[in-house]
Amino acid sequence: MDALNEIKRWRQELHQIPELGLQEFKTSKYLKDELTKMGYEPISILDTGVLVYLDNHQDKTLAFRSDMDALKISEQTNCSFTSCHNGYMHACGHDGHMAALLGLAKKLKEQPLKWKHNILLIFQPAEESPGGAKLIVEAGILKQYLSLIHI
């Protein structure tokens, strides 16, 4: 399967399992399963968050972050891949963000580059509320990182 079709598949599958912040258990399992298939050893954080760390033996780390949670909104679309969780949906693109970060993870595995940084992929729970970014910072996960790009 080519990269674009795989990202599309991930997005559609993730779109069907929207979960509120810090309740992203199915989403977390889905992400860990996909990352494991790629050859990674995903790390669980904050119960539902997921990390992948690529150690390039550098002093600094470059992090890429995606949000995971959905909103309490009933989906009213005619898509073939609508939410399976009545009353919840990915209404602001977090399904696409996760799919894009999975795409980056796959590309990094298929075509390893000589990075001048270690790489950290963060699938962050609770972006909408109750403040998953704050919880990640408070847990000390970002202390050593050079910069952060939010997908």
Where in the sequence are the language-model features?
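Beta-strand segments within the central parallel beta-sheet cores of soluble alpha/beta enzyme folds
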Residues: K116-Q124
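Basic phosphate/pyrophosphate-binding loop/patch that engages nucleotide-derived ligands
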Residues: G140-Y145
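Divalent metal-coordination and catalytic microenvironments
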Residues: L14, F64, H94, L121, ...
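Short acidic, glycine/serine/threonine-rich loops at helix termini
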Residues: E75-Q76, G131-L135
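Short glycine/serine/threonine-rich phosphate/pyrophosphate-binding segments
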Residues: H97-L101, P130-A133
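Glycine-/small-residue-rich active-site loops that bind phosphorylated ligands and cofactors
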Residues: L20, E128-S129
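Conserved small/polar residues in nucleotide/adenosyl-binding loops
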Residues: I149-I151
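Acidic/His- and Gly-rich active-site-bordering loop/insert found
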Residues: M1-H90, A99, K106-K116
